[in-house]
Structure formats: C-alpha cells, structure tokens
Amino acid sequence: MRTLANLIDHLGADFDFTVITRDHDLGEEEPFFDGVGAEGGGAGRAVGKARVWYLPARRLTMGNLRGLLRSLPHDLLYLNSFFSVPFAIKLLLLRRLGAIPKVPVILAPRGEFSAGALAISPVKKICYLAAVKMSGMCRDITWQASSHFEEQDIRRIFGDRASVVVAPDLPAVARPNVGAPRRLEKMPGELRVLFLSRISPMKNLDGLLLMLNGMTEPIQLHIYGPVEDLAYWEKCRTIIQELPSNVMVEYQGAVAHGVVAQIFAEHDLFFFPTHGENFGHVILESLTAGCPVLISDQTPWSALEENGAGWAFPLNRPEFFQQALRECVALGAAEYRDFRKRAQGFARLALQDEHTLQANQGMFALALQRGR
C-alpha cells in the first residue's frame, strides 16, 4: 500500500520497520516470492528500509500470527486497517487475550469510518464495532487520523476520550534524476479522461459513468485498476454499454506503479468521484504528473479550484462535474499547458509540507510514551 511505503521511506532512519503482509496483490493469486520468511526461522526479505514477511493465505491463521508476533521483537504494533480480518481483527483479539506481547498499538483506519465507507456492508461493520466496544480491545490504542475530518469520524464512534493523533499521510519521497514523463498535447474539442483506482463501490466508478451518460461532447475514458468486486464491475460494464457513441471507454486492467506517472501524463484529466479518501495518494500523483483533477469533496483536497489545479464537488451535484468536463473539452493546447503547470505547482506545495513529517514522528513518540 502506497501510504505504508511512504511512511517507511520517511521514518525508516528513525525506526526499524518489520512488515507482515499477504504474498500477493489484490485480485491476484500468484505470490510475489516463494516461501519468504513465512515459515519458521526465516528472516523476512529486505525491501527498502524494512524487512517484509510475505504470508500466503494458509499462514494467516490465529496460531501462525501468534507465533510470528511472539518471535519477532517489536516495541510497537502499527495496524493499517480496522476491518481487516487477518491484520487487525485477529491481532487485536490476540493482544486482548494476552497471546502476543501487549505493546502500544497505533491503528490507522484509512477512511474506514467515513459515512460512505460505513454504508458499504453496514450490518457486518455495525456488529463488529459493537463487539469491539464491548470487549475493550481498542481502549488503550492510539488512533491515527489523516485529517481533522477523520478525527471527527473516529470520535463519533469511540468517543471524546479516545486517543487520536492527526497525522496526515506522507507523500512519496522525491526521487532524484527522474525524467519528466512524455506528454500528449490537448486539442480543443477532445478530452482524454482517466480513472485509476481499485474497482469497488467506494471509488464510485458507476457514478462517474452515469455522469458521462449525460454528456454530448466527445470524451475518451481509460479505466485502470484491479477489479476488487466482480458484481460491481458487471454493474459498471452494463452502464458502459449504454453510454452514447460520443463517449468511448476502454478498460486497461491493473497497472504497475512504476508507469503510473506516464499514464497520468498521457491524459488530460483525472476523474475520481470517490465516496471518501482519508488522503488520496492517487490524487497527489496525478497533480505531480501535471494532470488536473476532477474529484468529489470527500477528500482533504478541497483547495483545488482556488489553486487552479482542478475541482472538488459534492456528489449530489452531478451537473457541476459535467460543466467542468465541458470546460476541459473546450480548452486548447496553450490553455491546458497552463492548467497542467498549476496542477504541478499545487502538488509541490503539498510535497514541501514539513508539518506532516513532524506530525507522524510525534505520533510514534506519543504512542511509545503511552505504553511505558
């Protein structure tokens, strides 16, 4: 996950990170490697500034996780989700039962408590939240909120006494000597639109397609990302088949992160009407590549229009999104070059925010202090 990779890149000189994760990507069955530290006695694999243990599904049992956590010395447990069964629910339960070391815990819910996220499979989530509250599993943990909005979401569920630290997600570390991606010129009367994300209800691809259904201008949409929910993807495909002839749609599948910047550069607009993002690294990646964005107002990126980098609109106003699309279609090459420069300038401001790094460092220090 990009968020965790960026965190380790920034803080890897201050902390020794050991990562436990699945041995395959979302929607894939082939493992990254064979038997890397998953069985007894292994030392994991060195990846950047961390050691990573890649576990196959058969090793994500309570017993194996217990053995692994007891064998790996650690001073703090960082959980990158609240609703993940193997990497949150099982670990919190093991800790509550005293089966693994009771070290301090930081839990980053990654937007899982937003109204949009909780509305997906709500019964299961409500039942689990009730069980967690009754058990006291989260009573002594430190919560990471990526924004003040997420802090409110956490406190709405766990109360004002919950220990919540606002530490925004860290951007990618700047890489030296990276060449600028090749760009395609924007001509008036055309628009190359990109959707790049996991294909799931939370990301709202169906909402995007329905907005395009009301357009009369020529638009080309490329969809990139792994299919997380097959039934949802079939729903999207049905909408695609009903789109007017002026809207051309192609699904390009999942994509390696190393070519993402080039993909953004080949498009005129990143269209991402998500139901909620606690940060939205993909939005920053788009801006960094000089691709303006058209997104929902359910992310921290609220100052796009005032910085000339794009738009953020409420999802209940589809006509706002459609008007922005029409404005983009009408723009010519020179106007769009300026648009791209403003997007990159806004990205540079976000990347230079030292407060974000200090907030993350302080969060770890506070959690460790609470555990003494």
Feature-to-residue mapping (PLM):
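A conserved mid-protein helix/loop that constitutes part of the nucleotide-sugar donor-binding site
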Residues: 2, 191, 195-214, 231-234
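Conserved acidic donor-binding segment of nucleotide-sugar-dependent glycosyltransferases
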Residues: 311-319, 327-333
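Membrane-proximal helix-turn-helix segments that form the acceptor-binding/catalytic region
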Residues: 6, 125-143
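Aromatic "clamp/platform" in nucleotide-sugar-dependent glycosyltransferases that forms part
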Residues: 275
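Glycosyltransferase donor-sugar binding loop
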Residues: 21-26, 196, 220-237, 253
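Short hydrophobic beta-strand element within catalytic cores of glycosyltransferases
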Residues: 292-296
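N-terminal subdomain of nucleotide-sugar transferases
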Residues: 1-36, 372
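Nucleotide-activated donor-binding/catalytic signature segment of Leloir-type glycosyltransferases, i.e.
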Residues: 51, 233-255
